[in-house]
From Swiss-Prot:
Annotated function: Catalyzes a trans-dehydration via an enolate intermediate.
InterPro entries reported for this sequence: DHquinase_II, DHquinase_II_CS, DHquinase_II_sf
Residues the UniProt record annotates as site (Transition state stabilizer): R19
Pathway note: Metabolic intermediate biosynthesis; chorismate biosynthesis; chorismate from D-erythrose 4-phosphate and phosphoenolpyruvate: step 3/7
Gene responsible for this protein: aroQ
Keywords (A to Z) from UniProt: Amino-acid biosynthesis, Aromatic amino acid biosynthesis, Lyase
Protein name per its UniProtKB record: 3-dehydroquinate dehydratase
Tree of life domain: Bacteria
UniProt-listed Enzyme Commission number(s): 4.2.1.10
Quaternary structure note: Homododecamer.
Active site as annotated: Y24, H102
Species this chain originates from: Rhodopseudomonas palustris (strain BisA53)
Family statement drawn from the similarity comment of this UniProt entry: Belongs to the type-II 3-dehydroquinase family.
């Protein structure tokens, strides 16, 4: 059974492809999940993709990652990035390598979007690469864990 990376998406990411496509692009959440599965399989890994608009669900997903022995977490906390100390604390508590991802460049947007609580609990943060940031995050996690791409 392959080792698993959790890919967690927060509020409004279920609307990717239709919500502000000039900011977030036309790719859908299904496209993100497919990209993540393809990227992970190239490293002999599996992904468990989950999305919720509710902070408590995201915290439960993070706890589930530890309970199931996941080796990494890729998280796009959406708007909770800028507000949720609880998500930060959950990521810090489980002690699983995590990468924060944002489709848009949060540092080039409104001032209230330029601070991230969750990034402080991740070993890396990627923003502005569109959905390709998820591919980069999985590749970065694999590198951090010493996992090389399969031929």
């Amino acid at each position: 059974m392959p080792k698993t990376i959790y890919v967690l998406n927060g509020p409004n990411l279920n609307l990717l492809g239709t919500r502000e496509p000039d900011v977030y692009g036309h790719a859908t959440l299904a496209d993100v999940e497919r990209l993540c599965a393809e990227t992970a399989s190239g490293y002999g890994l599996a992904v468990d993709c989950r999305q919720s608009n509710h902070e408590g669900d995201l915290i439960d997903f993070i706890h589930d990652a530890r309970a199931t022995g996941a080796i990494g977490i890729v998280i796009n906390p959406g708007g909770y990035t800028h507000t949720s100390i609880a998500l930060h604390d959950a990521l810090a508590a489980v002690q699983i390598p995590a990468v924060e991802v944002h489709v848009s460049n949060i540092h080039a947007r409104e001032s209230f979007r330029q601070h991230s609580f969750t990034a402080k609990a991740a070993f890396a943060s990627l923003c502005g690469f569109g959905i390709d940031g998820y591919r980069l995050a999985i590749s970065g996690l694999a590198a951090k864990l010493g996992i090389t791409a399969k031929a």
